[in-house]
Amino acid sequence: MLTFLIPTAKEMVIPKESYPHLLPQPSQAILKAMAAMTTEDLAKAYRIKEEAAKKEQQRWQDMTSQQSLAYPAYQLFNGLMYRHIKRDKLTTQEQAYLTQQVYITSSFYGIIPANHPIAEHRHDFHTRIKIEGQSLKSYWRPCYNQFAKEHPQVISLLSSEFDDVFSKDCKQLWIGPKFMAEKEGQFKTHSTISKKARGAFLTACMENNCQTVDSLKSLVFAGFYYHPDLSTDHEFVYIKKEA
């Protein structure tokens, strides 16, 4: 069985379905540290203006006082990649695929199933904060490595932010799809192409119920197709021709 890892997103939209917010134990220390920060501290940690930091401070305070509601993560996150993932009107098989084989890597919650209920928050591995004297990446590394050991065959749709959270020896069987546009024999890639394609790729995997590495090679989605000559055992390259 294939396991997919996808990143979080800064952009969020509130879904209709909500739950009480239950925070995993490793996240408690992060919440305590974030909630103790002043607006000025948060502005520096996030590299944002103090006005925007006030909103984030309120979110952390609401979590601390257990006032926060939680929403299925794949519905709450609404970045470009998420908007290209099929999230509505799923078949029973597609819903099972999304909730059992797709996991979200978070600097606040750890690695969670795609439908895990989470609260509105702003947090990533670039957030300037120490937890128990460690960087966020060092703090989460044991949990992330344990997940990797339990799920050796991972299809990673993660950004470079996550490259060194996992130890190298845990990623020996990982495959990272790469998405490129071809025009007049020239290949190019950029974040917009990649984000849209990640969502379309995951949707195609769900719709085709891909369970083997070889099944990924026959996928055609949003104009992309597998390119064997550019691909390696650990990087599957998908090309889209541009006019």
UniProtKB/Swiss-Prot annotation:
InterPro entries: YaaA (IPR005583). One of its GO terms (cellular component) is cytosol. Disulfide bonds: none annotated. It comes from Streptococcus pyogenes serotype M4 (strain MGAS10750). Signal peptide: none annotated. One of its GO terms (biological process) is response to hydroperoxide. Belongs to the UPF0246 family. The lineage of its organism: Bacteria, Bacillati, Bacillota, Bacilli, Lactobacillales. This is UPF0246 protein MGAS10750_Spy1880.
